[in-house]
Amino acid sequence: MRLPREIGPIHFVGIGGIGMSGIAEVLCNLGYTVQGSDASEGANVVRLRDKGIKVTVGHRAENVSGADVLVVSTAIRRDNPELMAARAQRIPVVRRAEMLAELMRLKSCVAIAGTHGKTTTTSMVAALLDAGDFDPTVINGGIINAYGTNARLGAGEWMVVEADESDGTFLKLPTDVAIVTNVDPEHLDHFKTFDAVQDAFRSFVENVPFYGFAVMCIDHPVVQSMVGRIEDRRIVTYGENPQADARLVDLAPNGGGSHFKVVFRNRKTDAAHEVSDLVLPMPGRHNALNATAAIAVAHELGIPDATIRKAIAAFGGVKRRFTKTGEWNGVTIIDDYGHHPVEIAAVLKAARESTGGKVVAVVQPHRYTRLQSLFEEFCTCFNDADTVVVAEVYPAGEAPIAGIDRDHFVLGLRAHGHREVVPLQEPAALAGVIAGLAKPGDYVVCLGAGNITQWAYALPGELKALG
């Protein structure tokens, strides 16, 4: 039995969240009555209201009146008044991943998982399937610049979704094609151990049906090891590794982007097929690898090389993924969501390759627990930044941890050999700090999953106001 059409109002608690808003938008476009609430106003709330979805600011018991279904994410606490009211009224409560799974049952699906690169890779797969006239439905974890939203309803039989592993619920998603970009120690607050993280990703791949396939990056040692332990499923490997089925070769910087080839080698016949002259308008090896994963899916689904080449060249990117927010006196300001050491290192390497000037990193650490558990990694991931400006930790609802703060992080970076580390006393001081550091040709890269994105967009104007 599939999701029936006659379901009444579907109420989303926390509808403004990036994952929840995408599901709500697709359900609305399918013709379901959708409503919801969020703790605050925001761009996603405004967008959903513009589509005719009723959104209330604040969580109150009366908000669920008339709802037939309540959708919650794992971020919603058990004492949330709307959740309590729904349970008191015997209204069915559905987890976000379960509702996404119901939508996925209506289509053939590509699900993209991995500690890093999910959102960009999801957007690339969507762009390639779009170009191949698949007209896919898409639910992403970030705003796709080409759509101006993180979700769209397509008329085709395929669906492309970002599979969020943070709470383990990605194992509920029924997918025909699974991509695994990488697996690093992350979300240990949920999984407790890295072994448990790896087990979850292995199960994600093993859940693929016999007629589907997985696309896995064997440049990553953990993923390569996982490939060797997975039996009875078809796996297409990718990476710069010479053993990859889809091999990224001849990668070279190309202005603000990359130029490369992807060579496919058939394991049965050893025949090679080359997709050459690929130009991606995004810098960095990590983005070229993300593109290789998407190209591998497109190739398997029969999309012609010329279509792949054209779609990659036209890829418009994702909001908060190496997004240029403006310039000042020849200085380029970049906003990026990177908040894990692996992501930060990749972004700064891309910045280094994109400019002959200096790279100034402005980092707002995200969560005390993440900074604590990965402190050594954070202290060694800024090597491609000439200067690191460190803001206070963005708590994301967490209580402070003694010895885990901006000043200790500054000391840690210096102790690990970084030559220039500057503590940011307050956000209002950022423009003055950058004005004293940056010269024409330099890149200023704002990094973090908190409200640093607002600083990045305000910074060009604030710098101009200084003269």
Swiss-Prot record:
What GO biological process term is on the record, naming one? peptidoglycan biosynthetic process
Binding positions (ATP):
114-120
Q: What is this protein called?
A: UDP-N-acetylmuramate--L-alanine ligase
The Swiss-Prot or TrEMBL record describes its family as follows: Belongs to the MurCDEF family.
TM spans, by residue?
A: none
Q: What does this protein do?
A: Cell wall formation.
* Record lineage: Bacteria, Pseudomonadati, Pseudomonadota, Alphaproteobacteria, Hyphomicrobiales
Quote the catalytic activity from the record.
UDP-N-acetyl-alpha-D-muramate + L-alanine + ATP = UDP-N-acetyl-alpha-D-muramoyl-L-alanine + ADP + phosphate + H(+)
Is Cell division tagged as a keyword?
yes
Which pathway does UniProt place it in? Answer: Cell wall biogenesis; peptidoglycan biosynthesis
* UniProt-listed Enzyme Commission number(s): 6.3.2.8
**Among the entry's GO cellular component annotations, what is one?**
cytoplasm
Q: Highest taxon of the source?
A: Bacteria
What keywords would UniProt list here?
ATP-binding, Cell cycle, Cell division, Cell shape, Cell wall biogenesis/degradation, Cytoplasm, Ligase, Nucleotide-binding, Peptidoglycan synthesis
Q: What class of enzyme is it?
A: ligase
Compartment(s): Cytoplasm
Gene Ontology terms for molecular function: ATP binding; UDP-N-acetylmuramate-L-alanine ligase activity
What organism is this sequence from? Nitrobacter hamburgensis (strain DSM 10229 / NCIMB 13809 / X14)
